[in-house]
Amino acid sequence: MGLTSQLIPVLVCLLACTSHFVHGHKCDITLEEIIKTLNILTARKNSCMELPVADVFAAPKNTTEKETLCRAGIELRRIYRSHTCLNRFLSRLDRNLSGLASKTCSVNEAKTSTSTLKNLLERLKTIMKEKYSKC
């Protein structure tokens, strides 16, 4: 019986430490996968890379990073749902971004300037690398 009462605090401590360890590294794993996918996409020479997209980074100054990532996800979804190229990579990227982005946002295309898919992916890669360096 005495052994059990001594083990409980140790087990609780181990559980707390491991859960912190796992949650602390989730950011790294997700960001690594996003960066790898972005590296693959930006290295490709594909006509889809010149498709027009809303410039989600030309948002007002008070826009949060989560809103910007949400808008990027919306644009990626719009591309891979309406074009057959790069679907696997763009959907994977969208899925990974959704974990870092806010759940609701809007892209008002009438007021938003346009860019290309390649520019969107390059800027997203820069942001993700900066975020990874701080993780």
Swiss-Prot record:
<feature type="disulfide bond">
    <location>
        <begin position="48"/>
        <end position="85"/>
    </location>
</feature>
<dbReference type="GO" id="GO:0005125">
    <property type="term" value="F:cytokine activity"/>
</dbReference>
<keyword id="KW-0732">Signal</keyword>
<dbReference type="GO" id="GO:0008083">
    <property type="term" value="F:growth factor activity"/>
</dbReference>
<keyword id="KW-0339">Growth factor</keyword>
<dbReference type="InterPro" id="IPR001325">
    <property type="entry name" value="IL-4/IL-13"/>
</dbReference>
<keyword id="KW-0075">B-cell activation</keyword>
<feature type="glycosylation site" description="N-linked (GlcNAc...) asparagine">
    <location>
        <position position="96"/>
    </location>
</feature>
<keyword id="KW-0202">Cytokine</keyword>
<dbReference type="GO" id="GO:0042113">
    <property type="term" value="P:B cell activation"/>
</dbReference>
<comment type="similarity">
    <text>Belongs to the IL-4/IL-13 family.</text>
</comment>
<feature type="glycosylation site" description="N-linked (GlcNAc...) asparagine">
    <location>
        <position position="62"/>
    </location>
</feature>
<dbReference type="GO" id="GO:0005136">
    <property type="term" value="F:interleukin-4 receptor binding"/>
</dbReference>
<feature type="signal peptide">
    <location>
        <begin position="1"/>
        <end position="24"/>
    </location>
</feature>
<dbReference type="GO" id="GO:0016239">
    <property type="term" value="P:positive regulation of macroautophagy"/>
</dbReference>
<feature type="disulfide bond">
    <location>
        <begin position="70"/>
        <end position="105"/>
    </location>
</feature>
<keyword id="KW-1015">Disulfide bond</keyword>
<dbReference type="GO" id="GO:0050776">
    <property type="term" value="P:regulation of immune response"/>
</dbReference>
<dbReference type="GO" id="GO:0006955">
    <property type="term" value="P:immune response"/>
</dbReference>
<feature type="disulfide bond">
    <location>
        <begin position="27"/>
        <end position="135"/>
    </location>
</feature>
<dbReference type="GO" id="GO:0035771">
    <property type="term" value="P:interleukin-4-mediated signaling pathway"/>
</dbReference>
<keyword id="KW-0325">Glycoprotein</keyword>
<dbReference type="GO" id="GO:0005615">
    <property type="term" value="C:extracellular space"/>
</dbReference>
<dbReference type="InterPro" id="IPR009079">
    <property type="entry name" value="4_helix_cytokine-like_core"/>
</dbReference>
<keyword id="KW-0964">Secreted</keyword>
<protein>
    <recommendedName>
        <fullName>Interleukin-4</fullName>
    </recommendedName>
</protein>
<dbReference type="InterPro" id="IPR002354">
    <property type="entry name" value="IL-4"/>
</dbReference>
<dbReference type="InterPro" id="IPR018096">
    <property type="entry name" value="IL-4/IL-13_CS"/>
</dbReference>
<comment type="function">
    <text>Participates in at least several B-cell activation processes as well as of other cell types. It is a costimulator of DNA-synthesis. It induces the expression of class II MHC molecules on resting B-cells. It enhances both secretion and cell surface expression of IgE and IgG1. It also regulates the expression of the low affinity Fc receptor for IgE (CD23) on both lymphocytes and monocytes. Positively regulates IL31RA expression in macrophages. Stimulates autophagy in dendritic cells by interfering with mTORC1 signaling and through the induction of RUFY4.</text>
</comment>
<dbReference type="Pfam" id="PF00727">
    <property type="entry name" value="IL4"/>
</dbReference>
<dbReference type="GO" id="GO:0045893">
    <property type="term" value="P:positive regulation of DNA-templated transcription"/>
</dbReference>
<dbReference type="GO" id="GO:0050728">
    <property type="term" value="P:negative regulation of inflammatory response"/>
</dbReference>
